[in-house]
């Protein structure tokens, strides 16, 4: 259980990019959030266009 907790902590630290104690409340992942949103929107648009093309073609 201790090993799983340590692995979770290290994974969280790697995800945020640094240790929480060394950073102010604005963490690096919050700075990258708009980039992630734009990627998600592009993916949704691409999927939506594919679905529309498939629907029009009758597939």
UniProtKB/Swiss-Prot annotation:
Signal peptide: none annotated. The keyword Transferase does not apply. One of its GO terms (cellular component) is mitochondrial outer membrane. Keywords: Membrane, Mitochondrion, Mitochondrion outer membrane, Transmembrane, Transmembrane helix. The chain crosses the membrane at residues 2-22. The keyword Membrane applies. It comes from the Eukaryota. Isoform Kastor and isoform Polluks are conserved only in mammals. This is Mitochondrial sheath formation-associated protein. The gene is MISFA.
């Amino acid at each position: 259980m201790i090993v799983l907790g340590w692995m979770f902590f290290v994974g969280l630290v790697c995800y945020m990019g640094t240790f929480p104690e060394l950073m102010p409340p604005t963490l690096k992942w919050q700075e990258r959030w708009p980039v992630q949103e734009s990627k998600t929107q592009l993916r949704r648009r691409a999927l939506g266009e594919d679905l529309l093309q498939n629907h029009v073609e009758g597939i």
